Amino acid sequence: MKLVVQRVTEASVTVEGAVAGRIGPGIMALVGITHEDTEEDAAYLADKIVNLRIFDDESGKMNLSLLDTGGEILSVSQFTLYGETKKGRRPNFMNAAKPDQAVLLYEKWNELLREKGVKVETGIFGAMMDVQLTNSGPITLIMDSKQ
């Protein structure tokens, strides 16, 4: 399971002209799932992301987590995170999980975040989406449950 994590002051996702999810300060997470991922991968990254100290304390030092700040998460499924570009000019997405497998794990991931007390907004799985965000910092991290 792979994430692109961005600290944001605000973020939203729109599908067919309608806002599907919107957050204030928190984390925008693009979520990629491969065919080898399990609920253990989702649990590991859910725990990691809510406790990741990427928010500033009163001294301006990144010392606070999402749980510490009461921030929100905008979670957007993103199979293209598993795109392979070594050969040719068109990405190969064979490493991405099939949609029927990925949607279950994506929903589990969001459920695990909510169980930790975090407000989670989402896009619509499998839809074409427009994502807008204001990256704070900028702080952008790539997280992988296998690395």
Curated annotation (Swiss-Prot):
One Gene Ontology CC term in the entry: cytoplasm
Keyword Glycosyltransferase in record: no
Entry EC no(s): 3.1.1.96
Motif (Gly-cisPro motif, important for rejection of L-amino acids): 137-138
Catalytic activity, as annotated: glycyl-tRNA(Ala) + H2O = tRNA(Ala) + glycine + H(+); a D-aminoacyl-tRNA + H2O = a tRNA + a D-alpha-amino acid + H(+)
Alphabetized InterPro entries for the sequence: Daa-tRNA_deacyls_DTD, DTD-like_sf
A molecular function (GO) term: tRNA binding
Function, in words: An aminoacyl-tRNA editing enzyme that deacylates mischarged D-aminoacyl-tRNAs. Also deacylates mischarged glycyl-tRNA(Ala), protecting cells against glycine mischarging by AlaRS. Acts via tRNA-based rather than protein-based catalysis; rejects L-amino acids rather than detecting D-amino acids in the active site. By recycling D-aminoacyl-tRNA to D-amino acids and free tRNA molecules, this enzyme counteracts the toxicity associated with the formation of D-aminoacyl-tRNA entities in vivo and helps enforce protein L-homochirality.
Family the UniProt entry places it in: Belongs to the DTD family.
Name of the featured protein: D-aminoacyl-tRNA deacylase
Lineage, top ranks: Bacteria, Bacillati, Bacillota, Bacilli, Bacillales
Gene: dtd
